[in-house]
Amino acid sequence: MQIPSINPGCGLALCASLALLVVALPAAAVIVDDSTDAMATLAPTKGAAASGTASFKSAGKDGMRIELELSGLEPGSVHGLHVHEKGDCSAPDATSAGPHFAVAGQQHGSLQGDNHHAGDLGNVTADSGGKAKASLVVPSSKMTLASGPLSVVGRAVVVHAAPDDLKSQPAGNSGARIACGVIDRETVGGGKAPMKPATN
């Protein structure tokens, strides 16, 4: 009878412990690939009351779907909405998020234009209760969930105090920033994956 060989570098007790450790790894620790959804939790800037969430999901060949829910707005008010270059909402007025996310040659404008900033998302309007919802699809030629210069991950979504006029440079005359949230990728089982810095 042939006796099975035993790996001299791994005693039975040690090997069994390692096997249990691998099996016990939580699903939330698994980082998913570039197609995974991302989200942002928006918090009010100093003196403001607006807050909410924004989700970023693949819309297949159409690009990326953005869904936004806000509260704490003035009833009937209209607000500019943009993705900003830096994933940093630490400043009291959110100026740490930098300018609108854009690639070389783009100018501020409306979603219907061909050469608007990648981060131009138009306006949202609050209802009688001060809440607002928006759902829009952004083509992959503007922004994407995948890694690279067009990635939305690691940037910030910002709500402004005034409407975006969709033409004034560089930001549509949309006023102060009243809410800001960093866009993070999610992980399997919930939670947040370590943020991969966006690259321009």
Task: Outline where the language-model segments fall.
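Bacterial N-terminal signal peptides
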Residues: 11-24
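N-terminal leader/targeting pre-sequences
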Residues: 2-3, 21, 25-200
